[in-house]
């Protein structure tokens, strides 16, 4: 299972979103954005507000913010930390406005200013960027801004003070001597590589991808135990298993739809079915709270968000808000690139 440890996997990638970085990623540079009008789009009795696409390229950050607004555990912790961090305060204010019912679309200006001040980098919005990289950068920045003087878990409805962060356990067992080594790492998401679009699989389930990614056979493995007993025969094979020891309250699942092939940079539109509810380790129950889709190709495209609010599914397409449904959200099997599941009973982690 590919995971995203803090400040390791995407640390270099998200720096390219900001001015001052050496270069822009090839992926971002190839994007030509297509977006809806920034005019006012009001929906009577809507539970959420839209976000203006101010630069014409803001769909990547708008969909991330809309997705976060549906995460109840995040809103709870932001509320508690408003007085200790300007970034927490402006993000909480923005997400609350998004959830405040029908009205004119809003802009995330104050929050983005706080984010730029916190990172001392200017957000590049003149070209389309990657929503997953922006999300990872935001999660890591929130973690760095977290106050360490108070045990917030004592007053939260969930036992950890970082809802995006979990602990992964890696077990490696030698196929020759059966020795087992165990290590732990911090992770914020699951990154899943997808099978080729024309591999013969018309539809692949998310659960099957997660299970296949959880356990891997490694043929070229050097076993320390075998080396001690017979240095000449220390090269062997092993079974590597990666699983959550303590899963996060908010589970991010990234579907990697862009890959490099012999034909260059390509987009993978393989159909991936995903459930509305998910169970980890046979005891941690999750519900799908939001998802981000991307339409287009590697050279142009547009992000939008499907999110659950007040028991109703909505489609947030920048400033345009339309009523959706769970079935419509689950039908985005060829365009979904980022899924947000929130734990239904977080206190079960205690």
Curated annotation (Swiss-Prot):
USP domain location: 49-344
Keyword Protease belongs to the record: yes
Organism (species): Schizosaccharomyces pombe (strain 972 / ATCC 24843)
Family affiliation: Belongs to the peptidase C19 family.
Biological processes, Gene Ontology terms: protein deubiquitination; proteolysis; regulation of protein stability
Gene Ontology cellular component terms for the protein in this record: cytoplasmic side of mitochondrial outer membrane; cytosol; mitochondrion; nucleus
Protein name per Swiss-Prot or TrEMBL: Ubiquitin carboxyl-terminal hydrolase 11
Residues at the catalytic site: 59 (nucleophile), 302 (proton acceptor)
CDD domains the UniProt entry points to: Peptidase_C19 (cd02257)
């Amino acid at each position: 299972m590919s995971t995203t440890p803090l400040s390791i996997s995407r640390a270099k990638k998200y720096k390219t979103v900001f001015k001052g970085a050496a270069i822009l990623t090839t992926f971002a540079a190839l994007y030509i954005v297509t977006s809806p009008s920034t005019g006012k789009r009001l929906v009577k009795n809507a539970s959420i507000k839209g976000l203006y696409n101010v630069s014409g390229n803001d769909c990547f950050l708008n969909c991330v913010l809309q997705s976060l607004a549906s995460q109840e555990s995040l809103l709870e912790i932001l509320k508690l930390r408003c007085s200790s961090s300007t970034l927490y305060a402006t993000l909480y204010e923005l997400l609350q406005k998004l959830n405040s019912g029908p009205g004119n679309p809003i802009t995330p200006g104050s929050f983005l200013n706080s984010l730029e001040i916190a990172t001392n980098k200017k957000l590049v919005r003149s070209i389309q960027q990657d929503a997953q990289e922006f999300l990872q950068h935001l999660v890591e920045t929130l973690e760095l801004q977290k106050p360490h003087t108070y045990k917030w878990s004592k007053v939260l409805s969930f036992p950890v003070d970082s809802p995006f962060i979990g602990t992964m356990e890696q077990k490696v067992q030698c196929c020759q001597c059966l020795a087992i080594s165990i290590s732990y790492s911090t992770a914020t998401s699951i990154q899943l590589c997808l099978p080729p679009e024309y591999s013969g699989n018309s539809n692949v389930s998310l659960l099957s991808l997660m299970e296949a990614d959880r356990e891997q056979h490694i043929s070229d493995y050097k076993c320390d135990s075998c080396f001690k007993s017979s240095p000449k025969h220390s090269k062997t094979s092993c079974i590597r298993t990666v699983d959550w020891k303590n899963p996060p309250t908010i589970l991010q699942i990234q579907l990697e739809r862009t890959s490099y092939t012999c034909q260059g940079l390509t987009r993978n539109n393989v159909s991936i079915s995903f459930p509305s509810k998910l169970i980890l380790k046979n005891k941690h129950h999750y519900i799908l709270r939001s998802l981000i889709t991307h339409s287009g190709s590697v050279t142009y495209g547009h992000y939008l968000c499907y999110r659950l609010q007040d028991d109703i599914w909505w489609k947030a397409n920048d400033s345009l808000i339309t009523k959706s449904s769970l079935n419509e959200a689950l039908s985005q099997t060829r365009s979904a690139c980022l899924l947000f599941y929130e734990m239904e009973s977080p206190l079960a982690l205690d």
